[in-house]
Regions:
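Hydrophobic alpha-helical segments, especially transmembrane helices
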Residues: 1-3, 50, 222
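Sec-dependent N-terminal signal peptides
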Residues: 3-12
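Active-site-adjacent loops and short helices of periplasmic peptidoglycan-processing enzymes
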Residues: 15-148, 152-161
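Penicillin-recognizing serine hydrolase domain
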Residues: 17-21, 88, 110-256
Length: 256
């Protein structure tokens, strides 16, 4: 056990010391425009939730049916309250709510384990050869992949209207209606700053854990072209923001 702890500490230190992975990809011409450490396998944190959403939507469940929220992990949704599956997906993609992700995984007809198997099968089918998903929220540092894998995931996710439209909602409300007086919960996007700065973002998902650092995956549409921008392992929120701004202003917008 002590050896395992030491190894995990060494791995975490290596992730923290390494430079961030940065990828800019032109999805219109299928061209990699910028690649920095894009083949490094590292934790992806809540970017995981994009795959969770795709896997759940594949089930074809009635999104207006209600389920009770799972409260075994952190989240803003109220304990022992029922929300529609649609509301859970919104809370997960916009607010990055972990309890929503766990609730959706456990809503699989055959349980959470079957859902995780479906997630990993989908990743392999898409060609995410270096990715593995241990949980549906991204809290686990065993959820790993490369920037190139995440690009592959985004190529699939951008074709799903629900994910595309929901992930860029800046702010909305969800009401817990099980009580006599409904309790309204404000759901604000975890990427509100960049969404306000760049109105060309059409898909967005952030991620943050100590092992993963500050992460973000974006799809932008500019000048009739579609671009994917992935940052993994930035040391701070401000550093992540500066990387995104540098790539958009100095790389993407300088293209012919």
């Amino acid at each position: 056990m002590k050896l395992l702890v030491v190894l995990l500490l060494l791995v975490n230190t290596a992730w923290a010391r390494n430079e961030p992975s940065v990828l800019l990809y032109d999805n219109t011409t299928n061209t990699v425009l910028l690649a920095e450490h894009t083949q490094q396998v590292r934790p992806m944190a809540s970017i995981t939730k994009v795959m969770t959403a795709m896997t759940y939507l594949d089930l074809g469940q009635d999104l207006d049916a209600k389920v009770e929220v799972y409260r075994g992990v952190s989240g803003v949704l109220l304990k022992k309250q029922h929300y529609t599956r649609r509301e859970l997906l919104i809370a997960m993609l916009v607010r990055s709510d972990n309890s929503a992700a766990e609730t959706l995984a456990r809503d699989h007809p055959n349980g959470r384990s079957a859902f995780m198997t479906a997630m990993n099968n989908k990743a392999q089918q898409l060609g995410m050869t270096h990715s593995y998903f241990d949980d549906p929220s991204g809290l686990s540092q065993k959820n790993v992949g490369t920037a190139l894998d995440i690009m592959t995931m985004l190529k699939a996710a951008i074709t799903v209207d629900f994910i595309r439209n929901t992930s860029v909602i800046q702010k909305t409300e969800i009401a817990a209606k099980d009580r006599k007086k409904p309790v309204r919960i404000i759901i604000q996007n975890t990427n509100i700053g960049l969404l306000e700065e760049f109105n060309t973002i059409v898909l967005s998902k952030t991620g943050l854990t100590n092992p993963a650092g500050w992460c973000v995956s974006l799809v932008l549409e500019e000048r009739h072209r579609q671009f994917m921008l992935i940052v993994l392992g930035a040391p701070t929120k401000d550093a992540r923001k500066k990387i995104v701004e540098r790539v958009i202003f100095s790389d993407l917008r300088q293209l012919n």
